[in-house]
Design a protein with these regions (language model features):
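A ligand-binding cleft/hinge motif common to bilobed small-molecule-binding domains
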Residues: 81, 97-106, 153, 176-177, ...
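Ligand-binding cleft/hinge of the Venus flytrap
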Residues: 48, 61-70, 148-166, 194-195
Length: 269
C-alpha cells in the first residue's frame, strides 16, 4: 500500500518535472532575441569605428539573425572572455574568428564553418626570417588565448619567447617597435594589416588549415541549428558572398561554399 501511495504521489511530480524540462528547452530554442559576444580587436572581422561595432562577422551574424527572425544585441569583451561567458550563459553566441577546435567543442557548440583560415608569419620587410622553421630563439608576438599560442607551444617554440597581448594591434605594435621579431596570427588579419603597412611582409607557407564557426552556448538549446539554417539562407540569397566583396575586395579564398560540419573540420588539440 505504501509503495502504491508513493507511486501515485511521485507520478504527477515526475510528469511535471518532465514538462518543465521540455518547456525550458523549447524556450531556449524559440528565442526571439539573442546576445552575441564579440571581440572588436580583430579587423576586418570585428572592429569598432566611431563607437559602432562593425566587420565581416558582425554583418554576417546580423544577416543570419534577420533570416531567422531574431534580434541581436552585440556584447563586446576580450577574446579570452568569450568561452567562459558562453559557458555561464551570459551570452548566447559569439563571433570573433573563433577556430573550431575539439577542446572548445567540449565547452561550447559550434555552427557549421563559415570561413577557412590559417596561421601565417608576419615580419618586418628587412627581416631575415623566412618562415616558421627559423623562428626558434626569436621573440614572437600574438594574441592571448588563441590558436596561435597553441600552435607555437606544440611546435617547439619556447614559451619564454612568446609575447601574448590582449589584442592583436598591440602585437603588431611590438613588431613595429622592435619589441618582437615576428607575429603569428590568422592569415586574413595579417594580410589586412600588411596592406595598410608596407614595412611588413608575410613569409613562408600557411601553418595550419583552420575553420571559423559561430560558437553557441550549450545552454541555448537549438540555437546552433538556427545559426546553420540562417547561414544556408544567406549563402543562397547571395548576402554571404557580398560580405567578401565588402570586406575582402571580392577575394573569396576563405569562403566555405559547401556545408562543413564542426566535427569534420575541427582542429584536434
Amino acid at each position: 500500500l505504501k509503495n502504491k501511495s508513493l507511486c501515485a504521489i511521485a507520478a504527477p511530480l515526475i510528469a511535471g518535472l518532465a514538462l518543465s524540462m521540455n518547456v525550458t528547452t523549447a524556450s531556449a530554442a524559440d528565442k526571439t532575441a539573442i546576445v552575441v559576444g564579440a571581440d572588436t580587436t580583430f579587423p576586418p572581422f570585428e572592429t569598432e569605428v566611431n563607437g559602432k561595432v562593425t566587420g565581416f562577422d558582425i554583418d554576417m551574424i546580423r544577416a543570419i539573425a534577420k533570416a531567422e527572425g531574431l534580434t541581436v544585441t552585440i556584447k563586446t569583451m576580450p577574446f579570452s572572455g568569450l568561452i567562459p561567458s558562453l559557458q555561464a550563459g551570459s551570452i548566447d553566441a559569439a563571433v570573433a574568428g573563433i577556430t573550431i577546435k575539439t577542446s572548445r567543442m567540449q565547452s561550447v557548440d559550434f555552427s557549421d564553418a563559415y570561413y577557412k583560415s590559417g596561421l601565417s608569419v608576419l615580419v618586418k620587410k628587412d627581416s631575415k626570417i623566412t618562415g616558421f622553421g627559423n623562428l626558434k630563439g626569436h621573440v614572437v608576438a600574438t594574441k592571448k588565448a588563441t590558436s596561435s599560442v597553441d600552435y607555437m607551444t606544440s611546435h617547439g617554440i619556447d614559451p619564454q619567447y612568446i609575447k601574448q597581448f590582449q589584442d592583436i594591434d598591440s602585437a603588431y605594435q611590438a613588431l613595429e617597435t622592435n619589441g618582437a621579431d615576428a607575429v603569428i596570427f590568422d592569415n586574413p588579419v595579417n594580410v589586412n594589416f600588411k596592406t595598410q603597412h608596407p614595412n611588413v611582409k608575410t613569409v613562408g607557407d600557411l601553418l595550419t588549415g583552420e575553420y571559423y564557426g559561430i560558437a553557441v552556448s550549450k545552454k541555448a538549446s537549438g540555437l546552433d541549428a538556427k545559426m546553420n539554417d540562417g547561414l544556408a539562407k544567406i549563402k543562397k540569397s547571395g548576402e554571404y558572398h557580398q560580405l567578401f566583396v565588402k570586406y575582402f575586395g571580392g577575394d573569396e579564398s576563405g569562403a566555405v561554399n559547401a556545408v562543413e560540419k564542426p566535427a569534420d573540420v575541427a582542429v584536434k588539440d
